[in-house]
Amino acid sequence: AFKNLMPLLGMGGETEKGIALPILPWWNAVAINDVPAQSDFYSSANGRLLNDLVRDAREPEKVALLQKVWRQRLSYRLVRSAEESKIALSSVAETRASLPFISDELATLISQQGLESALNQPLARILEQVQLALDNAQEKPDVIYLTGGSARSPLIKKALAEQLPGIPIA
């Protein structure tokens, strides 16, 4: 959601004076599992900040879309759309992520390559945790069980297969 969808809502933009817009409001908008981040995003102080950002942005119409997410409490739907795109990318090379609940024509194409790029850092953290577990256990597992959304992710399966060759992934 953050890397592929938030630029549609003005993330990475600048003010009229050429100053980069702060990233935190966009990050907090999609951090749906982080209660403090969501509290901050939906706070009245953030609402005032979003008003200021819309006023000062070089592309105010994009930032106004983030403001709509704030006003209508659309974070979960936004992240759900990203999740649906991620699921689709487990079986196709490219998918269209549409956000009609924000704006009728708001959409972007997301590719497996784009997803891979967006997941590089989180995937590296997952693999670090796997290595830590292996180091602590001092032995390799007989089988790897993936659950939840990760069970469908070819990226995670591939990375684990490279880290633990010869161990079946279920």
Where are these regions (language model features)?
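Phosphate-binding glycine-rich/basic clefts of nucleotide- and phosphate-handling proteins
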Residues: 1-101
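Short glycine-rich phosphate-binding loop at a beta-alpha junction
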Residues: 16-20, 29, 133, 137-149
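Localized chelating/binding microdomains
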Residues: 31, 52, 124, 128, ...
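Adenine-nucleotide phosphate-binding core of ATP-dependent small-molecule kinases
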Residues: 67-75, 104-134
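Phosphate/ATP-binding catalytic cores across multiple sugar-kinase/actin-like superfamilies
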Residues: 81, 85-88, 117-144, 156-159
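Generic beta-strand/beta-sheet core signal
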Residues: 92, 100, 147-149, 170
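Flexible loop/turn segments at secondary-structure boundaries
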Residues: 105, 149-155
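Conserved phosphate-binding/catalytic loops in two-lobed NTP-binding clefts
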Residues: 157-170
